[in-house]
Amino acid sequence: MAMTTASTVFVLPANVTSVAGASSSRSSVSFLPMRNAGSRLVVRAAEDPAPASSSSKDSPAAAAAPDGATATKPKPPPIGPKRGSKVKILRRESYWFKNVGSVVAVDQDPKTRYPVVVRFAKVNYANISTNNYALDEVEEVAA
């Protein structure tokens, strides 16, 4: 049995009216034929530009507001030891207790329970050489 492919183009215009308060956007979906077999889906979406009112152009306060909004506050200081620094492990139940390892990465999210990833030269009984520790479970040592 021979199968023939039909050349089809399907375009779905978005004629949806926007709800009050929602931004209006324009989108279209089209299925284009391909010679290689298979179908292709093309989705395009574009936002309509908001109409500029003449009152916002004339007032200097409105022009100054976007400049003030772009100002960012300074970054907080980094959490934990620096990457590559040597740390001593203070967690008693750890295989590497009182051993020294090097910091691989530190998660900067303050909600993370164990943000410090430490790599050791010696592997444990499960053939693992890295572990995560809390900030109070590591002590930075001079290299």
Swiss-Prot record:
Residues 1-44 form a transit peptide. InterPro entries: Elect_transpt_acc-like_dom_sf (IPR008990), PSI_PsaE (IPR003375). Keywords: Chloroplast, Membrane, Photosynthesis, Photosystem I, Plastid, Thylakoid, Transit peptide. Disulfide bonds: none annotated. It is a peripheral membrane protein. It comes from the Eukaryota. One of its GO terms (biological process) is photosynthesis. Belongs to the PsaE family. Stabilizes the interaction between PsaC and the PSI core, assists the docking of the ferredoxin to PSI and interacts with ferredoxin-NADP oxidoreductase. This is Photosystem I reaction center subunit IV A, chloroplastic. It comes from Arabidopsis thaliana.
